[in-house]
Amino acid sequence: MFAFIIGQVFSLASSVLISWKFGTSVEYDAFIAANKIPDIIYQLVAAGALASAFVPTFTGLLTRGDRERGWKLASAVVNWVTILLIGICTLSAIFSPWIVRNVLNAPLLNHGVVDASLADPLKFQYTVNLLRIQLIAPILFGISGLLMGIINSHQSFLWPALAPAMLSIGKIVGVLFLAPSMDIYGLAVGFLLGALMHGLIQLPALTKLPMVKYFFTLGKDLPETREVVRLMGPRVLGVAFVQLNSLVNTIIAYGLPTGSVGAIGYSFGLMMIPEIAIAQSMAIAALPTFSAQVAKGKPEDMRASLSALLRGLLLLAIPASLGLIFLRVPLVTLLYQRGTFDGHSTQMVAWALLFYAAGLVGHSVVEIVSRAFYALHDTKTPVFVGVVMMSFNVILSLWFAGLFTRFGWMPHGALALANSLATFLEMCVLLFFIRRKISGLEGRHTLDGLLRALAAGAVMSAALWAWLQWTQPLSVWLVAIGGVLLGVLVYQIGRAHV
């Protein structure tokens, strides 16, 4: 977890520098919108195979001692992913103007909440150019992500956990050294540099693995390759709906007043700091562990591991969620309000963070529970649930955006609220199905952990509310940092006495 915390420190540092340089400007809106397309390509082609199909299959081969077949499978998956990503990214670069004009400017999704920014030729040109630059990233991330899965399958987590920090360092280099002469394009080039370092930092760990071999093969003669494709199919469908939901949110925000896309990006990034440090660090380590327990025919061990992870997760995610909700304004002010990031930008980001923070627990639990399904070679259940809930999210996003506009509220907050509601429902349904699948979740222990976290969280919330009332006229440094320290202290005391 320490490596993930280091990664989030660098991520936060890069966000602070980006906000100082670009704020919630048209240029940064274009950068975030352009970044969405490469991210979708990577998630569909590489991440789906990695999370649900490749790691469990590869881990199973390692557990059975068939290392050569495992490396043939790994080589085949790397080769296929690289070929597909190069082809898709090349075509996307050629048709970038069409993608921006007809996808990011989709008129049906912007109906009723669109402003004049859609007719801004500068915003359009920024987005097209940034999209073409960033389309190199999915190729780099595809290879790097598979290396991460290979290394994690050997129960080695340090170097892969440090990889996200490299991406943030690349962005920092882009802001400090490239943006002064290249403007927003400097950030895009820094992003590519970070993507390259994301893979390079994992090479030392890869070279230390036993019997590492690379084969020039597409694995057509391997039944495990077909198994990966079989498992990947439903997962790709699920990822497609998740990414469609994310794309719809970006499209809606792209048509809202200037700064909405950036505000969504900053606020979601702040929510993701505890989510990555707590939930994703646990989930990445959990998948190989769950897969090995299933391969050894010990589902009861997996049930115990999952229950323990959920209890630990709730004890950390609940106070993190409440802390972000209460301290959102001083935290955003302290971290971002400087340079081109003004008071209005702070209000926009804090408004979205209010709703995103409410969904932190849901996002965190889904990260863990979905890994349990993948380890059981069941990709259909989480995909089906994800498709239904993400479709619900799209509907809520469109409906809430109109309602918020009608009430005179900043409409980008509607997208965050819809996301949190849909994710909470997804969490509940996945917990119901996994409980049936593995014959329980040690419910009494899990419920006890939940109630203790909620009780201590309630005490912490009362303390933070009083703190904010008392410290209103004081320095934002004192309010934010003191609030965090107070929250941690009160929560720990509360946990010890409930």
Label every PLM stretch briefly.
Residues 1-497:
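Membrane-embedded alpha-helical bundles of multi-pass transporters/translocases
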